[in-house]
From Swiss-Prot:
Cross-referenced PROSITE patterns: ABC_TRANSPORTER_1 (PS00211), ABC_TRANSPORTER_2 (PS50893), CBIO (PS51246)
Protein name from the UniProt record: Energy-coupling factor transporter ATP-binding protein EcfA2
Known role: ATP-binding (A) component of a common energy-coupling factor (ECF) ABC-transporter complex. Unlike classic ABC transporters this ECF transporter provides the energy necessary to transport a number of different substrates.
Record bears the keyword Membrane: yes
Name of the top EC class for this enzyme: translocase
GO molecular function: ATP binding; ATP hydrolysis activity; ATPase-coupled transmembrane transporter activity
Keywords: ATP-binding, Cell membrane, Membrane, Nucleotide-binding, Translocase, Transport
Membrane topology label: Peripheral membrane protein
Location in the cell: Cell membrane
Keyword ATP-binding: yes
Quaternary organization: Forms a stable energy-coupling factor (ECF) transporter complex composed of 2 membrane-embedded substrate-binding proteins (S component), 2 ATP-binding proteins (A component) and 2 transmembrane proteins (T component).
A Pfam match: ABC_tran
Classification via SUPFAM superfamilies: P-loop containing nucleoside triphosphate hydrolases (SSF52540)
Amino acid sequence: MDITFKDVSYTYQPGTPFQGIGLKHINLTIESGSYTALIGHTGSGKSTLLQHLNALLKPTEGVVQIGERQITPETNNKNLKVIRQKVGMVFQFPESQLFEATVQKDIAFGPQNFGVPEAEALERAKAMVELVGLPEAVLEQSPFDLSGGQMRRVAIAGVLAMQPEVLILDEPTAGLDPVGRREMMGLFEKLHREQGMTIVMVTHQMDDVANYADHVVVLENGGIAKSGTPREIFADPEWLTSKQLGLPTTTQFAQALIKKGFGFPKVPLTEHELAAMLRDQLPQGAGGANE
């Protein structure tokens, strides 16, 4: 299910003293099965764009096409339910939205709200708990008795239980330690790889952009400043710095090596890529005493 923005603009509180531009003339296609990262400094329009993906916001001008359905300024809110079932959104700190007495009931709430029979929704909850890496025993526990990382997994399981085709992630690893962040990103990569799920992620973690995304959109002042593959975007560190954006850790290290005289055939994005490129530049046998 492709998502297309056709000359989309959005104005906050139009006609009031608080009027502000959220998006301006966005033209963008997010292809089915892709993994897209939205990056930009605070206030660039990332979250505003994200909320158009499942019609939490409707465009002030232009058209958002989600699969076969169009969202325009005139679209009736009653027609948005199907879209919100197909496009699941994981907000920042989603664990704050947990409310049911047990984990199973909390996960089952979303599907039931969309008309899934209770018995089927409860079965989905069991399957989703396993999918997000939690033991079945947590189903009867209160979500508020779990650790912060477990609570976040429960909240994500609730979104996945609605069987969305597109998963929208707003800073999904915010507040997690490095191990928790790696596990969470591994879960999303598994969904993308094994189920072909389309993923759109807002993040400030450039390492995650380099390791997981296949397309990057850079937003600035409500518009698209640049888009391309991670390698294309991170190939110009000076431009990124001018936009108050950083580089992946590996790419930063490679830039330091370039200043020391090393050369690379392309921008290394991951540790494995950098190691392979450095290995090619070392004299044979220089990798260690065992070689």
